[in-house]
Amino acid sequence: MCIRDRLEIYSLYDLIYYFPYKYVDRSRIYYIHEIDGNMPYIQLKGEILGFETIGEGRQRRLTAHFSDGTGIVDLVWFQGIKYILGKYKLHEEYIIFGKPTVFNGRINVAHPDIDKPDDLKLSSVGLQPYYNTTEKMKRSFLNSHAIEKMMATVIQQIQEPLPETLSPKILSDHHLMPLTEALRNIHFPTNPDSLRRAQYRLKFEELFYVQLNILRYAKDRQRRYRGYIFERVGDVFNTFYSQNLPFQLTGAQKRVLKEIRNDVGSGRQMNRLLQGDVGSGKTLVALMSMLLALDNGFQACMMAPTEILANQHYETIKELLFGMDIRVELLTGSIKGKKREAILTGLLTGDVKILIGTHAVIEDTVNFSSLGLVVIDEQHRFGVAQRARLWTKNIQPPHVLVMTATPIPRTLAMTLYGDLDVSVIDELPPGRKPITTIHQFDNRRESMYRAVRKQIEEGRQVYIVYPLIKESEKIDLKNLEEGYQHILEEFPGCTVAKVHGKMKSAEKDEQMQLFISGQAQIMVATTVIEVGVNVPNASVMIIENAERFGLSQLHQLRGRVGRGAEQSYCILVTNYKLTEDTRKRLEIMVRTNDGFEIAEADLKLRGPGDLEGTQQSGIAFDLKIANLARDGQLLQYVRSIAEDIVDNDPSAQSPENKILWRQLKSLRKTNVNWAAIS
């Protein structure tokens, strides 16, 4: 077992930047007569009086009776028994550290850290660092304690100060600890204040370079790429506004539309992120932006991640443009032959004004006459390279409007999309009622079904979402196939549609149409219906095993209902065995419908690396010490410093700033330039 195989540590640099995830105070040695099984950790000095092996095979365990003269505790190992017996001797002095428990009336410490007093030196004194490891590493005795000892050896070898990665001015102006001192103290802090200062220095540097990278690229893009100028609001836009607009725009929609008009009329390329909760009217704003492109002689394109969503956008936009002489086409992987050829020809001649599609629109055979605006819906579901290909369909890049119904916390948006201008639609169209969310345990299913029957009798429709398609031997969860049969039996007079990710597209679309048209009263599905499906008549969303879903996913699923004028309900069904984090998630869902509040809570509970879509960014997983949920203020602070540098010295003429650009260049070798393309 090698450390590089499990933790991607290939050099001393990687090792020294592998930071502890927590620290435990080891400044005190207890006497055995002082301790009890409720203490979080204990540290004892004493000797092993004897060893005892109990059980056979997998049940085998080794117990060492350890004493300091005031009492006896049992040290217990379930693995590595031969190694332990060979390494530790009877009646020699050791310091042991671990978590106490009580078993058969005696204090036990399972798999403790054990050191000879003379071996402690840098490690295991004061605040002890703890490093993340895997179970396989622990079985090979490459545990946190082993990494700590390796780290102590490396730190002791640093005789000369390491080259600085921040300029003297930044270090001085912001009272930052020198790099070498910070690295020593992050691994082996001399006291809590030294640890705090080391963490601050390293977080500052990490977030500073993230922002410097984003802002420098944004500045460079503005310099290199001019945008098409949409000078006029013409007949197309005005006709739609006066004759086809389905309802009055909300104040938020008007504000966002004004921001977009300012962008496309400015002469610089628009690169804007449009956030809006489910049902907030983003598609209407996107359509009106596309009509501005048409008024100025350009084409527009909208790309969606799935055929279902692309079809839905196509039908919605065709309906909104009814009676207007605008050719709108749909291009997906399933459209072939003469129909496809006609669409491609229409794009080249300019007859096709608006193209809506999936990733099929980025294929090499798809070329436009004059593409002026690209709208990317649910963009986190596309890879960076896919988005880039659409962005480069013209010699001069088109304006880009990125839409998401997955609200992104402000700190995360600054990190992932810091080079984009951000617009937020933060109000729902008039007449929408807040969705009532209920947490219900599995054993109250009959009362839930009675409520569902009442909704169906009143003409409403119901979604039921399952975490699995088929039964699993590994986990005991509700699954769609069994659920489908159960629902058929429970609701004999109803038509039940079924959709999951392993169905062929044609079959999936057929089942979706059954539900969309109202022929099916109930749809059982997996999370394939999470994004974009719009059935205003659906008023109930039941999520089975809701404890298996993250906050963001629960919120997206809930957003499939509440799209009509009637009261809607979301029922979160779970068993009784829930973790504390799960209880918190469910309480948040019951308490609020606000997607941004939910996104902030999700960031705090899960961290940025786990949030849906951040994996595409190439940055969430690269943060070694900063935490976007906790370090939002620091992020804003370093962003202002980076902005000042980029604005005043964009070409790094100042000797002070050369070190910054040099360090940024070395960091960027390992990072994708995701900032370029939303």
Name every feature range the model reports, one short phrase each:
Residues 255-258, 269-587:
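Inter-lobe coupling/hinge segments of SF2-like helicase ATPases
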Residues 1-6:
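Conserved small/polar residues in nucleotide/adenosyl-binding loops
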Residues 18-45:
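OB-fold nucleic-acid-binding modules
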Residues 47, 99-100, 213, 546, ...:
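Short, surface-exposed secondary-structure boundary micro-motifs
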Residues 228-274:
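Conserved pre-motif I regulatory segment
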Residues 54-244:
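Upstream accessory/linker segments immediately N-terminal to the RecA-like ATPase cores of bacterial MutS
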Residues 512-522, 529-536, 541-544, 559, ...:
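Accessory helical-bundle/CTD segments and flexible terminal tails appended to RecA-like ATPase motors
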